[in-house]
């Protein structure tokens, strides 16, 4: 396997860079040294890493939406509205689907059509096509830091252009932006692509420019057991730090049970620090991001606000550094700027009300933390064993062996053998373990919790239970109970 978790050699980076910057005409505008100078002239208040570190030190949970449209002026207006009317602490630039698949000619067609019809014909901002100077306008106008959010297996050119354009945060990873998003991209290939991205971030760090990196925590966003998403997050964190990344934000997608969600967001940075230290890394700063519910939403706006508020409460009580906000129009498609801003304000109201409160440690919360730690360590230890100490090699082999298995992912490189289901209290458990490397004690815990739900509902745990859980929140509940 032509893959290793060592820092990319300068010669290899330079060889790839020449190829990457020639993938689209705007790549020729990238000048690394000039970009470093541009970053150093930006005010500290626009740097993502610094603001996250300040929030972590002060115990603040920040709110950030998702948003992106095709044309520059319209996207600028959208960001202005979300900052001023939504009171967003951080702003996004969500990238369109064509750019995510490196289909820049089709993205250009979308730009042209958007200009023609007077509205966005793309589901995001095509940053590669707009180029470095346009990206700098996006950074210069808002008062708060702006992040690139996308879903791209090969995000090398996008990273070159947006980082040269002044963005100070970049989402994604070789696993989290492949397995949930693509069908035919090998994990080995996407990890290599993202080693390039992380090395680029590391090069900025070496020049004194801090760029935040954020692996995508929720994965498929559908009943993903915390230990599975934690395993991927920690691996991607290790791969990033190996290339010189220092500011790392690890993510988790809300499952819905408050104790499990709080336990998950509390254990994630501790597990990451544990394994980074175990592998000899010392120069890193870990913050956390909590994603409000990523599954199906109620169509009723009032009910959608309820789901948003529950996610905000879990983020606040879990002491996440940042929460990614949903809109009350989630079930209907791309939200209006007004709906998006309303979701942020709803979230911030909850965050402000709960900022001085904490969830006391109870026997059940302690148990959830213990189970997440033990399960995640089982996955990570087996992954390291498979890679003979190399986490990049181990990650590829772990997916091949089913040691890491993401529920409901489209990728043919994912086993798809595990089945999750909720227990009686809505916590996500594992109904079918596939090849997850859990001890018999861990498996028995999951079996007992799901069996208890089966007894409560008068039915045998089965795939129908899983289906019921997938649709439950859209129908106004957390646990998919059978109709009485």
From Swiss-Prot:
Primary enzyme class: isomerase
Cofactor: adenosylcob(III)alamin
Reactions catalysed, as given in the entry: (2S,3S)-3-methyl-L-aspartate = L-glutamate
InterPro entries: Cbl-dep_enz_cat, Glu_mut_E, Glu_mut_E_C_dom_sf
Pathway connected to this protein: Amino-acid degradation; L-glutamate degradation via mesaconate pathway; acetate and pyruvate from L-glutamate: step 1/4
Residue numbers binding adenosylcob(III)alamin: 68, 123, 180, 297, 326, 330, 334
Keywords: Cobalamin, Cobalt, Isomerase
Isomerase listed as a keyword: yes
Entry-linked CDD domains: Glm_e
Residues reported to bind L-glutamate: 66, 100, 149-150, 171, 177, 181
Record-listed E.C. numbers: 5.4.99.1
GO BP terms in the entry: anaerobic glutamate catabolic process; glutamate catabolic process via L-citramalate
Homology family: Belongs to the methylaspartate mutase GlmE subunit family.
Entry function: Catalyzes the carbon skeleton rearrangement of L-glutamate to L-threo-3-methylaspartate ((2S,3S)-3-methylaspartate).
Record-given protein name: Glutamate mutase epsilon subunit
Gene this chain is encoded by: glmE
């Amino acid at each position: 396997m032509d893959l290793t978790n060592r820092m990319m050699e300068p010669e290899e980076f330079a060889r790839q860079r020449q190829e990457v910057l020639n993938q689209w005409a705007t790549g020729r505008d990238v000048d690394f040294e000039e970009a470093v100078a541009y970053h150093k002239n930006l005010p500290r208040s626009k740097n993502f890493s610094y603001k996250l570190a300040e929030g972590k030190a002060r115990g603040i949970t920040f709110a950030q939406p998702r948003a992106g449209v095709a044309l520059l002026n319209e996207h600028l207006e959208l960001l202005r509205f979300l900052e001023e009317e939504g009171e967003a602490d951080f702003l996004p630039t969500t990238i369109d689907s064509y750019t995510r698949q490196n289909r820049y000619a089709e993205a250009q067609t979308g730009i042209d059509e958007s200009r023609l019809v007077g509205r966005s014909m793309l589901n995001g901002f095509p940053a590669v096509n707009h180029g470095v100077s346009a990206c700098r306008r996006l950074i210069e106008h808002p008062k708060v830091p702006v992040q690139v959010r996308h879903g791209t297996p090969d995000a090398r050119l996008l990273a070159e252009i947006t980082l040269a354009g002044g963005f100070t945060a970049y989402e994604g990873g070789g696993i989290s932006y492949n397995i949930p998003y693509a069908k035919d991209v090998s994990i080995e290939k996407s990890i290599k692509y993202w080693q390039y991205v992380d090395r680029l971030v590391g090069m900025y760090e070496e020049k004194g420019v801090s760029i935040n990196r954020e692996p995508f925590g929720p994965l498929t966003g559908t009943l993903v057991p915390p230990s599975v998403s934690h395993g991927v997050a920690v691996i991607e964190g290790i791969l990033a730090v190996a290339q010189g990344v220092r500011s790392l934000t690890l993510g988790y997608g809300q499952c819905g049970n408050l104790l499990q969600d709080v336990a998950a967001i509390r254990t994630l940075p501790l597990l990451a620090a544990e394994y980074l230290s175990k592998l000899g890394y010392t120069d890193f700063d870990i913050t956390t991001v909590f994603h409000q519910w990523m599954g199906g939403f109620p169509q009723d706006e009032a009910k959608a606000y309820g789901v948003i508020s529950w996610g905000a409460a879990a983020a606040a009580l879990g002491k996440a550094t940042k929460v990614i906000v949903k809109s009350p129009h989630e079930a209907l498609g791309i939200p209006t700027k007004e709906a998006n801003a309303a979701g942020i304000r709803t979230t911030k109201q909850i965050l402000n009300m709960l900022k001085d409160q904490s969830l006391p440690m109870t026997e059940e919360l302690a148990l959830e933390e213990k189970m997440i730690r033990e399960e995640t360590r089982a996955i990570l230890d087996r992954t390291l064993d498979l890679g003979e100490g190399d986490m990049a090699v181990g990650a590829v082999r772990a997916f091949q062996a089913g040691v890491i298995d993401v529920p409901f992912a489209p990728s043919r490189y994912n086993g798809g053998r595990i089945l999750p289901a909720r227990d009686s209290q809505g916590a996500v458990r594992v109904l079918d373990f596939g090849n997850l490397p859990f001890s018999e004690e861990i498996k028995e815990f999951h079996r007992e919790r799901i069996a208890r739900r089966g007894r409560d509902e008068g039915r045998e745990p089965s795939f129908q239970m899983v289906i019921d859980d997938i649709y439950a929140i859209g129908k106004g509940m957390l646990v998919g109970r059978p109709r009485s």
